[in-house]
Amino acid sequence: MKYDVGISNAIIVSSHNGYEPFIGSIGVKETRITCVMHGEIEKEECEIWIDGTGKILMPGLVNGHCHGDMTLARGLGDDMTLLEQNHAFADTGWFYTLINDEDRFYSRQLTYCEALLSGTTFIMENMYWGLGKESVRAMKEVGIRGALAEDIRIDFMRPDEFVSGEFLDEYKKQCEEAGLIPVIGGISEEDYETKRLKRIRDIAGQKGMMITCHLAENTWRREIVQQRYQTSAIDYLYHNNLLDENVIGSHVVYATGEEIHQLAQSNAKVVNTPLCEMKICDGIAPIPEMVQNGIRVCLGTDGAMWNNSNDIFREMKGMSLIHTMNSGIRSLDTKTILDMATVNGAMCFDLEKDY
């Protein structure tokens, strides 16, 4: 057969032609799309032929920031800010003492299934607690592509106790054998310390891994850095050579014009989670200004604790509406937001050839 799978008569929407929709077909051979065309693919050419009439066919969505461990906690953080949640759930270590590794395994799998059912085909898992090989198995069994961010700390409540180099080597090997991308989970602003951050940067460089971290997320974390270092988190990282193309900053709600330039100059990546930012009252990120400065912004959902959903389509709508209201009707056009959900996310993980 010419194609393993053929989909005919679908409404095709893709960045390759500026999202100009057309009725057409695609052919897939050995997991790769090898043909995109106007008109039909004949049934006889395909092992499996699917009639896409009335359906939209577009690239899979990318969720660049998610905490699958938190899906079991959906709804428990409603009507609370992140700081209030920190206080409310500190006594259980963010539910650590209430759930076991099996619970976390299935919480992640539920997250990945929800993501797939809403069109997401790549997801970044930001782990609070490592599950070793089970982290890889949870994602591989569901069949979603993704990146796994292993926290650099043995326990995220103890910022100076790092996992070993041998552990990271084995973890990276397990991820790559499963077709997943290994990432190092960094630290948040309340744990900033120059030697600690440079140590994380050096480990990531030695292992050939990207770093993801919560960055400029809210006012209380911003104030911690301001009081400790008399500057902002972004400026602090920039001037200590801790921002580069291997850093993925999540949220980035509080960024001045100068800090946006610093992000752009360093080629750091940004993943914004607009519904999370609204739900826990973090604020409105200056996304239009980031786009204007050439920063490739991606989308994420965060964990269900801070969103109640794993649906990137909802994030696209939220991104559009909040900035239309805040910055004007054409501050972010539809094509730009589609890029955030697809090709920008792919570029974040060096997968642009797949999009």
Q: What is each stretch, according to the model?
A:
Residues R74-I144, G165-E177:
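Alpha-helical scaffold segments that flank or form the walls of functional sites
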Residues L72-F105, A147-E150, F156-M157, T219-D244, ...:
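Active-site gating loops and adjacent loop-to-helix segments of metal-dependent hydrolytic enzymes
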Residues T219-T231, E259-A264, C281-M290, N307-H323:
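Histidine/acidic-residue-rich catalytic or RNA/ligand-binding cores of hydrolases
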Residues V13-S25, I280-C281, I287, A346-Y355:
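Acidic, glycine-enriched loop/beta-strand segments at the rims
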Residues M1-E44, K55-I56:
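N-terminal metal-binding scaffold of metallo-dependent hydrolase/deaminase domains
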Residues E134-V253:
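Metal-coordinating catalytic core of metallo-dependent amide/deamination hydrolases
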Residues H239-N246, P288-Y355:
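His/Asp/Glu-enriched, well-ordered alpha-helical/loop segment
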